[in-house]
Amino acid sequence: MTFPPSPVDTDMEPTRPSRRRWLWIVSGTLAIVVAAVSLGVAALQLGLPWQMGENDRNHVYEGAAGSQRYQVHLPPQHDGTARLPVVMAIHGCAMTGYGWNSMKSTTQFNSLADREGFIVVYPTQLISRNVIACWNSADPRHQQRHTGEPALLAGVAREVVQKYDADPARVHVAGASSGAGTAVILGVTYPDVFATVTSVAGGEYGLNQVDPDNPDATPPLDTARQGWAQMGDRARRVPLLVIQGEQDEVVPPLVGTRLVAHWTAVNDLVDDGLPNDSLDPTTKTMSVPGAAGRHAYTRTEITAPDGSSIVEAYRVQDMGHAWPGPDGDGKYTDHAGPDASAIMWEFAERNPMS
């Protein structure tokens, strides 16, 4: 006796997807996942549309060294009646310029800019260049003029001056952590672009050459000679502001101490090409005690005989790896520290490029 095919047998075979169809389904699903991840990464790095203010502008600089995304904040004073100063703020590792955990929210420069009347520029690093969004200040390929990140960021600064008719003699750069290292690099590779440099939790030019276990083997003068050489025929005294936490375990206080000595030596070499203290600098230090939940700190000013700034340094007690200030919003802020953003702007305002 024979039996006809069961309904199950006859119905299942024709409806089973072919191998090609399964490949289409899997490929399509993967494409959706990749697109979603890409959008998520973009949102983290570049922010969301509603995070932009009315006076914020997003741009992409294109140059010989590649492309660079950045956001500009225009203060109310940008009305065509005067050429405004520019502050470029460079974020640290695991941060962005204007997305998640941003330099914009950490520094609160926009509010200060609206009061004081300067343009703010926030470049942002992409994970395609560094997987944790650090600026590559420890890589020699990004420590020279006309190449790498220095060329990109100097190009951004020049583009902002041109686009927004800003004052080229008052373009300043500030950075945090790896961004501070990049800011210092810009000070020696593009002294003709940046009037002052501010380093918060950063180190000297060529810090990657210094052995953390034997730092004395590479004195700050050695790296200072390299920094001065990078300046070339554009060499000039570039004022530097240094802010360093005494409890910083990422960038130890010794790195900040070396940076002050390094930059003083760079300026000494600029004067006559010799490490001979020809500038005859004056050093003054004052201590500010902690009170009402605020960190104590010391402020050291190193000035030339004419009173012009060489280095100004803040050492903040009980502060770790952070940008200090009362209003900062981010993973690397310290509300008990002095107001780094206000200090930076006051320093920049009295030190235009001469």
PLM region spans:
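A conserved short beta-strand
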Residues: 193-208
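Structural cue for short, hydrophobic secondary-structure segments
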Residues: 89-92, 122, 242, 315
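Active-site glycine-rich loops that stabilize anionic/oxyanionic intermediates
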Residues: 84, 92-95, 319
